[in-house]
C-alpha cells in the first residue's frame, strides 16, 4: 500500500526544481522503464500492478494516483538522474544542437528521432525544456536511454568545434541540392522564434527545407520535430 508521503513525493517530481533537488525523475510504462533499466539507469523505486515485476506491488487505483498519464501503464519507476557535469563535450559524428526547444512533446519526439537516425549526441541550450520532464520522458518512448544529452552554452560549444555547423533557415540552400557531410552539428531552433541570433552567427552551412506548393498557399512553417526528422533523414540518405 502506498503511503501519503510516497504519493506526495512522486507527484512532486513533476516540477523541475524538485527533480533538480532530489536528482530524480519519473518514467512510466514497461517499454520506457525497461529500456532505462537495460541502459544502466539506477532505479530509486519501482511501483507496479504486476506481481511478476520487481518493486512495490500497487493497485491500479494507487498507480493512478502517482501517474502523470491519463491512462497509467502498469509500471512507474523513479530513476536517479545521471551526473553529466563531467561528461566531455566533444562532438563526434553527427550531433544535434537544440536552441530553446520549449514544448516537451517536441523535445521528446526529437530525442526519439535522434535515436532512430543514429545521432551521436544532443546538446541543449539552457533555455531548452528539461529532458527529465515526465512529458518529455514519455514522448521519447525509451530513446532517452540511448542518446547522450548534455545541457551547455551552445555559443561556447559551437565556437570551439571544427566540424561543419548546419542550421535550418529561411534564407538557406535547398537541403535536397546541398552537399552534406557525414559529420557535423545540426542546429534546430525554438518553435516560435527559430534559431537565436547569437547561435545563428555560428552556423557555417544554412539549409532550407523547401515547400512544394505549386503556387497555392501553404503552412508558414514546419513543426520543429518534423523538420528535424526530414533533416536527419537527408543526412543519412547520402
Which residues are covered by each model-predicted region?
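Glycine/small-residue-rich loop that forms an oxyanion/phosphate-binding "nest" at active or ligand-binding sites
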Residues: 55-84
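RNA substrate-binding interface of SAM-dependent RNA methyltransferases
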Residues: 38, 88-173
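Active-site/ligand-binding-proximal alpha/beta "capping" segment
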Residues: 167-219
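Boundary-proximal intrinsically disordered activation/regulatory segments immediately upstream
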Residues: 1-50, 128-129
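Amphipathic alpha-helical repeat scaffolds
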Residues: 29, 102-110, 219-226
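Structured adenosyl-cofactor binding patch, chiefly the S-adenosyl-L-methionine
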Residues: 116-117, 131-145, 197, 201-238
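Short acidic-hydrophobic, aromatic-tinged amphipathic segments that line or gate anion-handling sites
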Residues: 1, 57-59, 145-155, 207
Amino acid at each position: 500500500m502506498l503511503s501519503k508521503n510516497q504519493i506526495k513525493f512522486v507527484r512532486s517530481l513533476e516540477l523541475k526544481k524538485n527533480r533538480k533537488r532530489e536528482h530524480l525523475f519519473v518514467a512510466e510504462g514497461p517499454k520506457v522503464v525497461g529500456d532505462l533499466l537495460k541502459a544502466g539507469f539506477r532505479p530509486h523505486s519501482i511501483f507496479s500492478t504486476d506481481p511478476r515485476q520487481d518493486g512495490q506491488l500497487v493497485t491500479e487505483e494507487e498507480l493512478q494516483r502517482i501517474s502523470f498519464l491519463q491512462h497509467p501503464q502498469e509500471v512507474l519507476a523513479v530513476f536517479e538522474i545521471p551526473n553529466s557535469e563531467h561528461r566531455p563535450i566533444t562532438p563526434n559524428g553527427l550531433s544535434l544542437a537544440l536552441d530553446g526547444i520549449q514544448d516537451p512533446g517536441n523535445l521528446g519526439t526529437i530525442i526519439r528521432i535522434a535515436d532512430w537516425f543514429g545521432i551521436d549526441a544532443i546538446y541543449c541550450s539552457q533555455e531548452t525544456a528539461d529532458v527529465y520532464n515526465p512529458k518529455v520522458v514519455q514522448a521519447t518512448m525509451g530513446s532517452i536511454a540511448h542518446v547522450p544529452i548534455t545541457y551547455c552554452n551552445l555559443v561556447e560549444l559551437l565556437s570551439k568545434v571544427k566540424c561543419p555547423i548546419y542550421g535550418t533557415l529561411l534564407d538557406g540552400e535547398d537541403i535536397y541540392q546541398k552537399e552534406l557531410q557525414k559529420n557535423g552539428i545540426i542546429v534546430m531552433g525554438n518553435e516560435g522564434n527559430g534559431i537565436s541570433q547569437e547561435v545563428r552567427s555560428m552556423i557555417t552551412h544554412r539549409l532550407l527545407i523547401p515547400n512544394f506548393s505549386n503556387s497555392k498557399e501553404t503552412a508558414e512553417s514546419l513543426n520543429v520535430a518534423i523538420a528535424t526528422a526530414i533533416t536527419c533523414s537527408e543526412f543519412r540518405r547520402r
